[in-house]
């Protein structure tokens, strides 16, 4: 997207109204993918200039930093202390026991791919393991942080291995219109999955990625890529009424030895005429979620992490625990949430079944119903009706 075309995409109001998608001038070329390739630009946002929003920040070395007092950088000594002195309580059992405790279901779309894509005000969510969810809303099908590989690692011969297989392959997915990437850690941005999705869908698939990730996406062959800073927005061509806003989170980025925080991290707020979806990505707890809820809430559905949180002295800055996940649910004003980032990879020291148990305790503490924060089986779908009653 060139500068002249970008300048045509102007906002027409200072405040995002909760009752409808913001109207904006849109003289974008209807030709589609050619005009959107390798884009570093978005609509011009008035609210990005507001004084009370937390803007992305870089340090003196030009790398992104977390702007909240709730953040502390992970250090090599603290990492070594965790690895050497902390006991691993994950206790992942054999496959037979896992099949009983964490069954992997066949997603509905494998046998009936034509059924994918809800109409009107309906919303359906399918958990595909870890932070990968498929969301059908407002005539679009979205995928978050796709990883279908056996390992979350630069090599499929070593590194964290799934103890629950992916419920489907990329080839078995239905039509996907957009992929949301929260950050570049290997368990959220898997090169093999990106390449497979790009080979399957090509330029028909729009990628929404954080600032600094565009070059990496290009090297994977992806062309229909939109790279955004916090509080910037864009859309899928032909679906201008659904707005994708890159919003803050408290985390960090790294893929190689020397590239710490050269790429931004964040969450996603997807705002449609019928539904609103929030994807928290990977995050510690911070004040950003109240800002997001204030501007874009209430959300019909939020996908919020509940796992990889022990030991707290090391993990709390980068990974919320189940109680903090409930706080995010409240902060963003989610009507329903779905638990992600658990039950797939053993990335921390809590027992592999502890996250949903602790989530139930937290929901009771905050006087919320268990059905307010869904815990799905791998491959399971849930349909959310317009009257806010969920149906399997």
UniProtKB/Swiss-Prot annotation:
Keyword Hydrolase listed: yes
Membrane topology: Peripheral membrane protein
Record InterPro entries: Metallo-B-lactamas, NAPE-PLD, RibonucZ/Hydroxyglut_hydro
Keyword Secreted belongs to the record: no
EC number(s) per entry: 3.1.4.54
Annotated region described as Disordered, given as residue ranges: 1-39
Tissue expression pattern: Widely expressed. Highest expression in brain, kidney and testis (at protein level). Expressed in adipose tissue (at protein level).
Keywords: Acetylation, Endosome, Golgi apparatus, Hydrolase, Lipid degradation, Lipid metabolism, Membrane, Metal-binding, Nucleus, Phospholipid degradation, Phospholipid metabolism, Zinc
Positions bound to an N-acyl-1,2-diacyl-sn-glycero-3-phosphoethanolamine: 186, 319
GO CC, alphabetical: cytoplasm; early endosome; early endosome membrane; Golgi apparatus; Golgi membrane; neuron projection; neuronal cell body; nuclear envelope
Binding-site residues, Zn(2+) 1: 183, 185, 251, 282
GO molecular function: N-acylphosphatidylethanolamine-specific phospholipase D activity; zinc ion binding
Subcellular location(s) of the protein: Golgi apparatus membrane; Early endosome membrane; Nucleus envelope; Nucleus, Nucleoplasm
Task performed by this protein: D-type phospholipase that hydrolyzes N-acyl-phosphatidylethanolamines (NAPEs) to produce bioactive N-acylethanolamines/fatty acid ethanolamides (NAEs/FAEs) and phosphatidic acid. Cleaves the terminal phosphodiester bond of diacyl- and alkenylacyl-NAPEs, primarily playing a role in the generation of long-chain saturated and monounsaturated NAEs in the brain. May control NAPE homeostasis in dopaminergic neuron membranes and regulate neuron survival, partly through RAC1 activation.
Oligomeric and partner information: Homodimer. Bile acids promote the assembly of inactive monomers into an active dimer and enable catalysis.
Protein name: N-acyl-phosphatidylethanolamine-hydrolyzing phospholipase D
Native source species: Bos taurus
Gene symbol of the encoding locus: NAPEPLD
């Amino acid at each position: 997207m060139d500068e002249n075309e970008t300048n045509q995409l102007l906002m027409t109001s200072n405040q995002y109204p909760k009752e409808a998608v913001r109207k904006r001038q849109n003289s974008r070329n209807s030709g589609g993918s050619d005009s959107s390739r390798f884009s570093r630009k978005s609509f011009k946002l008035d609210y990005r200039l507001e004084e009370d929003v937390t803007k992305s920040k870089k340090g003196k070395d030009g790398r992104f930093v977390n702007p909240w007092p709730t953040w502390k950088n992970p250090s090599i000594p603290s990492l070594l202390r965790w690895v050497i002195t902390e006991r691993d309580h994950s206790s992942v059992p054999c496959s037979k026991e896992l099949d009983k405790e964490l069954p992997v279901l066949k997603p509905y779309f494998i046998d009936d791919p034509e059924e994918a894509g809800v109409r009107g005000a309906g919303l359906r969510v399918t958990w595909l393991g870890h932070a990968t969810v498929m969301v059908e809303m407002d005539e679009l099908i979205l995928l978050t942080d796709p990883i279908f590989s056996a390992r979350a690692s630069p090599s499929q011969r070593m590194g964290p291995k799934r103890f629950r297989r992916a419920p489907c392959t990329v080839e078995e997915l239905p039509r996907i219109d957009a992929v949301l990437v929260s950050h570049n850690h290997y368990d959220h941005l898997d090169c093999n999955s990106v390449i497979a999705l790009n080979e399957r869908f090509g330029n028909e698939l729009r990628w929404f990625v954080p600032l600094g990730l565009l070059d990496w996406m290009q090297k994977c062959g992806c062309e229909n890529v939109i790279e955004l800073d916090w509080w910037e927005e864009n859309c899928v061509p032909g679906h201008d009424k659904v707005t994708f806003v890159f919003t803050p989170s408290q985390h960090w980025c790294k893929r190689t030895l020397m590239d710490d925080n050269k790429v931004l991290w964040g969450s996603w707020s997807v705002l449609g005429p019928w539904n609103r979806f929030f994807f928290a990505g990977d995050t510690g707890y911070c004040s950003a979620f109240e800002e997001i809820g204030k501007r874009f809430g209430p959300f019909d559905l939020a996908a919020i992490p509940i796992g990889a949180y022990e030991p707290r002295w090391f993990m709390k800055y980068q990974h919320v625990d189940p109680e903090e996940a409930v706080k995010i649910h409240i902060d963003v004003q989610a009507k329903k949430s779905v638990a992600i980032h658990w039950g797939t990879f053993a990335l921390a020291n809590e027992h592999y079944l502890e996250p949903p148990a602790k989530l139930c305790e937290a929901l009771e503490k905050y006087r919320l119903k268990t059905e307010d924060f869904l815990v799905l089986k791998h491959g399971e779908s849930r349909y959310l009706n317009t009257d806010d009653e969920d149906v399997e």
